[in-house]
Amino acid sequence: MRAESYRRRLWDFAVGQYGYVRAADAHDIEIPVVELGKLAARGQIRHVAYGLYRFDDLPPTRFDRFFEAVARVGGDAHLTGDAVLALHELGQVNPQVVRVGTSRRVRAQLPKWIAIERETLPDGDLTSYESIPSATVAHAIRSCRDTVMSDRLLVAVDDARRDGLLSVAEQREFRAELEGAG
C-alpha cells in the first residue's frame, strides 16, 4: 500500500483523537507500525512519545493535553481527581498537572505536567468524556474534597448536575455532605 494511503487512514483515525495516533491504533487499523516512524521521518507526523504520534496540521483544542496525558501513560489510564473537574471546567480548578490514574506501574519518563495516581477503580467509576478515558465526575468530586474548597465544589456539583454529569440524587448527596463540612 502507498504511504499516502497509510497517512490518509491514520489521519482519518486521528481526527477522532485530537490528532493523536498510537502504535496500537495503527496495528488495529492494519497499518504496519513501522509506517508511523517513516511518516515522522518525512515530517508528516510528529513523534510525541514512545508509541504516540500527532498530526500537527490538525488544530489544537483544549482537550489535547488531557488526551495526550492518558495516551502517554497507556494501558488502563484515565483522568482522575481535579483533572476530571478541569476537563469539564467545573469548580474553578486549574491544576498545574494533569492527574492520570492507573492500576499499573508506569516506567515511562513523563513530562512534569503529568502526575500518576496509582488507583484501581470499579467499572462504575470509569467512563469516557470527549473520547478520553476518565473517572466519573462523581468520583472526581469525592476525591477532591480535601484539596478543593467546599464552596467551589458546591458550585461544581450544581454545574455538573446542570450539564447532566450528575444525577439529582448525587447532587443532593454531595450538597448535604459539602454543606455539612462547610
Positions of the model-derived regions?
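Short gly/ser-rich loop at a beta-strand->alpha-helix junction or flexible surface loop bordering the NTP-binding
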Residues: 2-9, 15-139, 143-182
